[in-house]
Curated annotation (Swiss-Prot):
It comes from Methanococcus maripaludis (strain C7 / ATCC BAA-1331). Keywords: Cell membrane, Hydrolase, Membrane, Transmembrane, Transmembrane helix. Belongs to the UppP family. The chain crosses the membrane at residues 11-31, 35-55, 80-100, 101-121, 135-155, 180-200, 202-222, 226-246. This is Undecaprenyl-diphosphatase. The gene is uppP. HAMAP family: Undec_diphosphatase.
Length: 249
């Protein structure tokens, strides 16, 4: 049952800007069990597949453009790779520290508050100047740096990248697309690196399937909320979650 619940939590919260890793750590604390970082990473592969389906047209468009040596798509792919580098660096060199944070509900509560603040600010950002193809390389790097902070449980990956993209003047729909696209190598890498620690029990595989299905729902919801200017709802939720964690866990 625990694996099933964690699968639902991962699927829904991976793309909603409320921190999936933070919620997985919270529910692990509620269950009074040891954080299974390997299983958490396995669930990331489920949400990777959900994103791949959700942005399949953009992925095929990029692959097709690169195969035709279209400079515009080659540049876009290069920017996505650049956005990924900071998170990969942090994951490889600070993995032990990150794993230790999963056991600190106090830090998770603080980080959730930070995510809440970013979501309240995001709704006020509406420059609508740049598309995913027109953003400069420097902007791509900045978004990547923000994503790197999301390796900490409580700091939302989608929340930080959406905030950064909107702050830098990207159109809302393009900010969503860019956030989803740049999540692909990160979630895939996180899953593959820890795959050897997964038991592949029936419960874990079922949790994987549930995480995939709820991930698709989460993707749809966050796209609607960003375009509709309702990210502040997630901000208020993060404050409530932070209060709960700091008070009761």
């Amino acid at each position: 049952m625990e694996e099933l619940i964690l699968g639902i939590v991962q699927g829904l919260t991976e793309f909603l800007p409320i921190s999936s890793s933070g919620h997985l750590a919270i529910f692990t604390a509620i269950f009074n069990s040891t954080p299974d970082v390997g299983y958490f990473a396995f669930l990331h592969l489920a949400t990777f597949l959900a994103v791949l389906i959700f942005v399949k047209s953009e992925v095929f468009e990029i692959i097709n453009g690169i195969s035709k040596k279209d400079k515009e798509y080659i540049n876009l792919a290069s920017k996505l790779v650049l956005s990924t580098i900071p998170a990969v660096f942090v994951g490889l060199f600070f993995g032990d520290f990150i794993e230790s944070v999963f056991s600190s509900t106090y830090l998770i509560g603080i980080f959730l508050s930070i995510t809440g603040i970013l979501m309240l600010l995001s709704d006020k950002l509406n420059k609508n100047l740049k598309t995913i193809k027109s953003i400069p390389y420097f902007d791509a790097l900045i978004v990547g740096v923000f994503q790197a902070f999301s390796v900490l449980p409580g700091i939302s990956r989608s929340g930080t990248t959406l905030f950064a993209a909107l702050f830098l003047g990207m159109k809302k729909e393009d900010a969503v697309k860019y956030s989803f696209l740049m999540s692909l190598p990160v979630t895939f890498g996180a899953g593959i690196l820890e795959l050897h620690n997964v038991a592949f029990s029936t419960e874990q595989i079922f949790g994987f399937v549930i995480s995939f299905l709820t991930g698709l729902l989460g993707l749809y919801l966050v796209k609607r909320m960003v375009i509709g200017g309702k990210l502040k709802i997630f901000g208020y939720y993060c404050f409530l979650a932070s209060f709960f964690v700091l008070t009761f866990l």
